[in-house]
Structure formats: C-alpha cells, structure tokens
Amino acid sequence: YFDDMGYYNPYYLAELQPNDRSTVRINGNTFFNINPIKGLNIRTSQAVDAFDYRNSHKAYPEGPFEGAGVASESFERYYSFTFTNTAEYKFSLSGKHHFTVLAGQESIITKNENFSATSKKMVDTRMMLMAAGAESEVPLHTMYDKVFNSYFGTISYSFADRYYIDLAARRDGSSLFAKNNQWANFYSMGAMWDMRKENFLQDVSWLNSLQLKVSYGTTGNSGISAYNALALVGSGLLYNGQPGIAPSTVGNDNLTWESMKTLNIGISTKVFDRFSVELEFYNRQTDDMLMGYPLSYTTGHGSSVENVASM
C-alpha cells in the first residue's frame, strides 16, 4: 500500500478510500437602464452567486489501517444576492464646468448551510450506507445569514479640464455587529490639478504631463464571522448523563465597525515622452481594530471578538 518513498499508493486510495465530490455553481446578473432625460441614467441590477457542494468519502473495511470501515457525507449550500440601484446625472455649465452626481443604494443578502455525518465500524463493502455502521459520530450542522445595506452618493466636478474635485459619502449597515452599532458613516474627498495645461507650462516642450493629487477619506471593515456580537448557547452536551445546553460564545454589545482614515498626497510626471515618475506620501490610521481578545479561562471561554486597538 506504500510506494518506495513511503507515500500512499494512489491506486490504493482510489480503490479502497474513494472520495467523490460534486459542485453545482450559478453565477449571473441582470440589469435595466433607462434615460428619461438627457444626462440622466437610472440603473437597477441584480446578481446571484450560489453553489451546492457535496462530498462522499468511504474507507472500505478491507483496508489495512485503523479507521477502515467508515463512511461520511457532507454538503454545503451557499447563495448571495446583490441588489444595486443607482441614478447618475451628468451636466455642464458654460462649457467649462462639468458635473457628475450619483446616488445609489445596495443590499447584499448571504445565506450558508453546512451539514456532515460519519458512520463507523462497517463490515461489508457492499453496504457502505450511512445506516450500516455500528457507531456514528454526532452530526455537524451549521448555518448563518448576514445582510449588508448601503446608501451612497458622489459628486465629481472639473473646471477647464485642469482642476478636479471628487466628494463621496456613504452610510453602511451590517447585521454582523451589535444592534446599536450596525450603521456607520464614511466619506472621502479628493482633488487633482493638471498643471501641464496651465499657460505658464505650455512652452515647456520636454514636459509631457504634471499632476498634483491629494485625497483624504475613511473606510470601514466588517470582516468578522456571523453572530460574533451575540451571546450564543450550544447544545449536544451531557452533564451527569443528561442532555443540556451551555453558553458557547461571549456576546459583545459594543462591537462596531473597524475604521480606516487615509491621507494621500502625490505628484506624477512624464518627461521626454519616455520617463515617468510618481511620488506619493500617505498616512493611514486604523481605529477600533477587530481582533480576537483572549479571555481568562475561568470564564469558560478562550476568546471573544472585540474592537481592541488603533494603529
């Protein structure tokens, strides 16, 4: 059952420990645009990402190693729906002032479910069904739902194709956080000066482009698992031979968004039609960092997710 290097023989694994996997995946999106007046574009779109994964593993009884005579089945079902609605209006004034105004809303709904079961001590290769084992492990069954909502708007302005200003604001909400902290506001602003188009640089033939840029903004991070903010209980436990439930995770009513503030100042240029140079300075500060925080073992828990620090 081993080759000369001490590894499992692939033929042995295929014949005596077969593992069958199958996945059905769906990705798709639809959208609808209308232009009721000149410069106004209204768009609605829907997207779906879904899959159904199944795995069947068997270790036939005639295998030479401990753990033979085992069958396991598992599946995972996941889907995520994204709904986006935007309205964008572009217009100009006096031929030099150009505006783009956008307002939008987005919702993302995600659901996931996992299930697995294992049956042991099977004695007949012809009866490798889950009900044929003399012993079975406690099945694993998990599921979660999460929802993300956002309202956002942007304004872009340019004058004479040389001065540019961008403003953006958004309000994001996530079901992952505590009830009173699910919503947070974020914003950004930026400006760019195309100096090459100024009159005092028109006669500099070797200078192809020269741009000065500055931006400042905030963003949020909600990268935690579902229900980290809630105090949960678990079942399937025995105490003095009797089934019961017990606390499984520590809740945190103060859990909120991690936020990042970023300042960026840069200059870019191109000379002699071949050499490009770009210099940037940035400063980034992260507040309310989401991390696992160790707890005293006297609490009965190892850690909890908290907003622990700034960096």
Regions found by a protein language model. Give the residues of each.
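Extracellular/periplasmic, surface-exposed regions of secreted and cell-surface proteins
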Residues: F2-A59, A68-M311
